[in-house]
Amino acid sequence: MVVSMREGEIISLFMKHFERHSLGDDAGFIKLNNSWLLVTSDMLVWKTDVPDFMTPEDAGRKVVTMNVSDIAAMGGRPMAFFFSLAVPGDVSEDILRGIARGINEGSKVYKLKIVSGDTNEADDIIIDGGSLGIGKRLLLRSNAKPGDLVCVTGDLGRPLTALLLWMRGEKIPREIEEKARNPRARVEEGVKLSSLANSAIDISDGLSKELWEIANASNVRIIIEEERLPISDSVKEIVSDPVKVALASGEEFELLFTIPREKVEELDIDFKIIGRVEGGNGVYIKRGRKIEELEVLGWEHLAGGIDVEL
């Protein structure tokens, strides 16, 4: 019997069958003396993850960044990258060379050693990447505390804006396209956060979804303020509802984190305070004087992709 299931439901189904695991965060973890070995994997599928404004080199870099970002969100420093590649039998050599160059470039940016690989045949190009890292103190989604401030690195909205413009066949401004084609994982920020923050997650599926992930995992209530969202100026100039785009934009690879109020001044990174953590449940957004429950927006595999328009 075939049943339509969403990505989160499939993950939950598998976790119910695993008796020993450290799943449920951006990366798995194993204790090694005074440190933690961090392990993650993340897959790129050409049809859904590589719009044609991206090059094969972009795709290769992206699969490295996707995996490194998971290590960064746990407060770790990535050390190695590995991947499996499945391709159709008629794939062009130019595409393969481009992917290889991109993976190499990404590994150099993050100072990674490429340690393993495998190839197979499939109907689409699939790059299943993975990364290993080391962390001293783990940042978990499940450790947000009432009284924490909710913060985010960088700016939001550009990757989704690029995708929406592309879907409409419109020209993508260079500043918008730049982050969609070549995002950077916040490795140094994650390492600095590891000694100060209580919880963290990377923004791969959209700010809204990641806020709900932290709130549910930590059993807390999160309230963010609309006017505090760090929305890119270039996004504000293009889209009709920049707040909705910022909340839904995935593949940002920024870090969303919660931190005790008294430790904020110790942070030497670029970030914005967007809200607070309270006792209770759920995620809410303050719009002027009104507070309402935050809609879950963002990318959803197996459910039609994105649910936002320009």
Swiss-Prot record:
**Additional remarks:** Reaction mechanism of ThiL seems to utilize a direct, inline transfer of the gamma-phosphate of ATP to TMP rather than a phosphorylated enzyme intermediate.
One GO MF annotation is: thiamine-phosphate kinase activity
Give the record's keywords alphabetically: ATP-binding, Kinase, Magnesium, Metal-binding, Nucleotide-binding, Thiamine biosynthesis, Transferase
Gene3D superfamilies xref list: PurM-like C-terminal domain (3.90.650.10), PurM-like, N-terminal domain (3.30.1330.10)
The record's comment on protein family reads: Belongs to the thiamine-monophosphate kinase family.
Which amino acid positions bind Mg(2+) 3, per UniProt?
D26, D70, D202
* Disulfide bridge partners, by residue number: none
Residues reported in the UniProt entry to bind substrate: D49, E251, W299
SUPFAM superfamilies under this entry?
A: PurM C-terminal domain-like, PurM N-terminal domain-like
Amino acids binding Mg(2+) 5: D205
State the HAMAP family in the record. TMP_kinase
**Residues that, per the record, bind Mg(2+) 2:** D42, D70
From the Swiss-Prot or TrEMBL record, give the protein name.
Answer: Thiamine-monophosphate kinase
Annotated EC: 2.7.4.16
What's the stated role of this polypeptide? Catalyzes the ATP-dependent phosphorylation of thiamine-monophosphate (TMP) to form thiamine-pyrophosphate (TPP), the active form of vitamin B1.
Superkingdom classification of source: Archaea
- List ligand-binding residues for Mg(2+) 4: D26, T40, D70
Q: Name its pathway.
A: Cofactor biosynthesis; thiamine diphosphate biosynthesis; thiamine diphosphate from thiamine phosphate: step 1/1
UniProt-annotated binding residues for Mg(2+) 1: S41, D42, D118
* Alphabetical GO biological process terms: thiamine biosynthetic process; thiamine diphosphate biosynthetic process
Asked whether the UniProt record includes Amino-acid biosynthesis among its keywords, one would answer no
* Reaction equations catalysed: thiamine phosphate + ATP = thiamine diphosphate + ADP
Q: What species is given as this protein's source? A: Pyrococcus abyssi (strain GE5 / Orsay)
What InterPro entries does the database record attribute to this sequence?
A: PurM-like_C_dom, PurM-like_C_sf, PurM-like_N, PurM-like_N_sf, ThiL-like
Amino-acid positions noted as binding ATP in the UniProt annotation, renumbered to this chain: G117, D118, R141, S204
**One short Pfam family name for this protein?**
AIRS
Q: Which CDD domains match?
A: ThiL (cd02194)
